[in-house]
């Protein structure tokens, strides 16, 4: 009887865990983000983002302390959310947080943007427009 209760407890615990996000190698990530209904999120600081990011990515800074609040406003839970950072450290935390928040389809770039750049994949830089008022 104890074995049966233990087995039931293990099964119950296993079914209550948070679903996991997928970490994709660079080529698979590139194919995935080319699909419609995918939102690409750069979780680095705005300064890092401005230096260069994957085309079409929006910036939600993981370190800023309001990631969840910004994600709720900017991201659609019915779409695939593709996250990345420079070395795939912050993006892991961001992906886990998104899953906890109820996002069902979250993917993360394995090895981060540095490997993307080293492989010669395209990035774009944010160029600030300076307007002078007289």
Where in this protein do the model-derived segments appear?
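Sec-dependent bacterial lipoprotein signal peptides
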Residues: 1-13
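Rhodanese-like catalytic fold shared by cysteine-dependent sulfurtransferases
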Residues: 4, 16-38, 47-80, 90-134
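Intrinsically disordered, low-complexity boundary segments flanking structured domains
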Residues: 11, 45-48
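Structural scaffold elements adjacent to functional motifs in cytosolic proteins
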Residues: 40-42
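Short, surface-exposed ligand- or partner-binding patches at beta-edge/loop junctions that are enriched
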Residues: 84-85
